[in-house]
Amino acid sequence: MTLVEKILSKKVGYEVCAGDSIEVEVDLAMTHDGTTPLAYKALKEMSDSVWNPDKIVVAFDHNVPPNTVKAAEMQKLALEFVKRFGIKNFHKGGEGICHQILAENYVLPNMFVAGGDSHTCTHGAFGAFATGFGATDMAYIYATGETWIKVPKTIRVDIVGKNENVSAKDIVLRVCKEIGRRGATYMAIEYGGEVVKNMDMDGRLTLCNMAIEMGGKTGVIEADEITYDYLKKERGLSDEDIAKLKKERITVNRDEANYYKEIEIDITDMEEQVAVPHHPDNVKPISDVEGTEINQVFIGSCTNGRLSDLREAAKYLKGREVHKDVKLIVIPASKKVFLQALKEGIIDIFVKAGAMICTPGCGPCLGAHQGVLAEGEICLSTTNRNFKGRMGHINSYIYLASPKIAAISAVKGYITNKLD
């Protein structure tokens, strides 16, 4: 059995396999300022209550602070939902991106996580089954605590080799190129291999985050000592809690797993990767795009706005200035990340370099505010999507890369991984 088959089998209490349609009890449900109002409107038509307010998380992150009257009205309606049903796990604007908030506070191995956002797949990094749902489905989940799902097939991706120049973002872009934008439609992408086994949680979250860019239902990684260490140090779980999680740990026997496809990627000789307009699977080695002039750089998002990402970017910006023709926007993924970056002097480095620092949230990723692109402008971004018109004008251009490449390129004024 694959990892998702085992997780879902444990959830329902009997053995399931790819293709089975099952009803599942949800452990954690989340919507944000964009999807809570839609789910709330649908909920009103089916129920006067929610199944468990303590298992519902609402986070304002897409338009924070509200940048239009419509955005303000949406948040007003979402806040009505929060107050009406006594949702204690409410995170107002400025606390961070919903997925970073879930990672910092809520998700545990073996959970079934339902989110009103397509990048809910991020949380498979904890050894959970996490996936996105539409507003009507989220309304039903809020009302009943249940949903149905077809057990997805699984693509196994093993990352092997050694290469200190390659980041998790480079790896997941390479995987996107290999699988393609529709190659994993309604499938789970199960990551493994020595590189993943030694990767920290920030990197694993980046890998799983972009499963949806390949059409995936979720990305998933076995929980292990790195997972438990994160939960203990970053989340404050007790030794007793960790021991219980270890006892319930789910692992995969490769010889018994029935995968739709198995892929191995050796990063030993791999160049750093860049996705070029207008799809995340349109990926090229950086040598193919080096020298492309840019107007804007964005470092942030649920893909690469975590503390390790900001630390990496700061290494290349320290003592340097952003190119005169480039706007550099930096948005920490959460308040917690922001505060620690302040404490470490990282924000000081960014500000002195000439960066604009914005409220923790999604920022320009969705093209709503805080860095919208004009016609013909080119942005190098650490986000996950570079669709046509995604960040502004329909005739603007987005390249995707790692925080390292983003920082260096901001200094040079063109896409590069070289400072000298």
From Swiss-Prot:
Cofactor (UniProt): [4Fe-4S] cluster
Pathway linked to the protein: Organic acid metabolism; 2-oxosuberate biosynthesis
Catalytic reactions of this protein: (2R)-homocitrate = (2R,3S)-homoisocitrate; (2R)-homocitrate = cis-homoaconitate + H2O; (2R,3S)-homoisocitrate = cis-homoaconitate + H2O; cis-(homo)2aconitate + H2O = (2R,3S)-iso(homo)2citrate
Protein's UniProt keywords contain Membrane: no
pH dependence: Optimum pH is 9. Active from pH 8 to 10.
Enzyme class, UniProt record, top EC level: lyase
SUPFAM superfamilies recorded: Aconitase iron-sulfur domain (SSF53732)
Enzyme Commission number(s) of this protein: 4.2.1.114
CDD domains cross-referenced by the UniProt entry: IPMI
Further comment found in the protein's record: The heterotetramer that can be formed in vitro between HacA and LeuD cannot catalyze citraconate hydration or the dehydration of 2-isopropylmalate or 3-isopropylmalate.
Purpose: Component of a hydro-lyase with broad substrate specificity for cis-unsaturated tricarboxylic acids. Catalyzes both the reversible dehydration of (R)-homocitrate ((R)-2-hydroxybutane-1,2,4-tricarboxylate) to produce cis-homoaconitate ((Z)-but-1-ene-1,2,4-tricarboxylate), and its hydration to homoisocitrate ((1R,2S)-1-hydroxybutane-1,2,4-tricarboxylate). Is also able to hydrate the analogous longer chain substrates cis-homo(2)-aconitate, cis-homo(3)-aconitate, and even the non-physiological cis-homo(4)-aconitate with similar efficiency.
Family statement: Belongs to the aconitase/IPM isomerase family. LeuC type 2 subfamily.
Name of the protein in question: Methanogen homoaconitase large subunit
Lineage: Archaea, Methanobacteriati, Methanobacteriota, Methanomada group, Methanococci
